[in-house]
C-alpha cells in the first residue's frame, strides 16, 4: 500500500488534491481513499490530507503516520510543521519551491508550482500543479486519469487551465530525472 500525506494551508487545496489523486488512482483501476485532517479550521492554518493507493481493498481508516510520499504545497510550512515526521526510510518529498532544498532525511524533488500556477491560472493555487508533478515523479497515477478527474472537479475553462498546468508540471518532473 502506498500512503501519501499532503501538507498545505487552509484554502490552498490540499484536501481537494488528496481527493483528486484518490479518484485518479481509482480511474486507473486501483483501490484508493482520501481524507482530511484539520486542526484549527481557518484560512492559512496548516492542514494535512491523506491518500492511500493499493491494488487490494484498503481496510485502514486512520490518518497516515508513516507516509511513502509527502507533498508540501507551501514551502513556508517546512519551518512550522515537521513535514518529514514519520516519513519512511526510502520516502520521497515533493516540495513547492522556486529555490533548492536538501535534507539528510529524505529524497526531495522540488518544483516551482507557484510560478506555474501564476503563469497558467493567474492565481497561486498550486494543488493541481503539484498533482501533475507527483504523477511525473512517481508514476503512481496516469496523467490521463489525473487530467480527466481535474476536468470533472473543475468544469469549463478553469478545469482546462488546471489540467494544462498539471500536464506542464508532469512533463517537467517526468523529464527531470
Swiss-Prot record:
Key words of the record: Oxidoreductase
Entry keyword annotation includes Membrane: no
Gene3D superfamilies the record matches: Pyruvate-ferredoxin oxidoreductase, PFOR, domain III
MF annotations from Gene Ontology: pyruvate synthase activity
Pfam families in the cross-refs: POR
EC number annotated for this UniProt entry: 1.2.7.1
SUPFAM superfamilies to which the protein is assigned, alphabetical: Pyruvate-ferredoxin oxidoreductase, PFOR, domain III
pH dependence of function: Optimum pH is 10.0.
EC supergroup of this enzyme: oxidoreductase
Reactions accelerated catalytically: 2 oxidized [2Fe-2S]-[ferredoxin] + pyruvate + CoA = 2 reduced [2Fe-2S]-[ferredoxin] + acetyl-CoA + CO2 + H(+)
Thermal properties: Optimum temperature is 80 degrees Celsius.
Record note on quaternary structure: Heterotetramer of one alpha, one beta, one delta and one gamma chain.
Name by which UniProt lists this protein: Pyruvate synthase subunit PorC
Highest classification ranks of the organism: Archaea, Methanobacteriati, Methanobacteriota, Methanomada group, Methanobacteria
Amino acid at each position: 500500500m502506498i500512503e501519501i500525506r499532503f501538507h498545505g494551508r487552509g484554502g490552498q487545496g490540499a484536501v481537494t488534491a488528496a481527493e483528486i489523486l484518490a479518484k485518479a488512482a481509482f480511474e486507473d483501476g486501483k483501490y484508493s481513499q482520501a481524507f482530511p485532517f484539520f486542526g484549527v479550521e481557518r484560512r492559512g492554518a496548516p492542514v494535512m490530507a491523506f491518500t492511500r493507493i493499493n491494488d487490494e481493498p484498503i481496510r485502514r481508516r486512520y490518518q497516515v503516520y508513516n507516509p511513502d510520499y509527502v507533498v508540501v504545497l507551501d514551502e513556508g510550512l517546512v519551518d512550522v510543521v515537521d513535514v518529514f515526521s514519520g516519513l519512511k526510510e526510502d520516502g520521497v518529498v515533493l516540495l513547492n519551491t522556486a529555490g533548492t532544498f536538501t535534507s539528510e532525511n529524505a529524497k526531495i524533488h522540488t518544483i516551482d508550482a507557484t510560478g506555474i500556477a501564476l503563469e497558467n491560472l493567474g492565481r497561486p493555487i498550486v494543488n493541481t500543479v503539484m498533482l501533475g508533478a507527483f504523477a511525473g515523479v512517481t508514476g503512481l497515477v496516469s496523467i490521463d486519469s489525473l487530467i480527466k478527474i481535474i476536468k470533472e472537479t473543475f468544469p469549463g475553462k478553469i478545469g482546462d487551465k488546471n489540467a494544462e498546468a498539471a500536464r506542464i508540471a508532469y512533463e517537467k518532473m517526468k523529464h527531470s530525472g
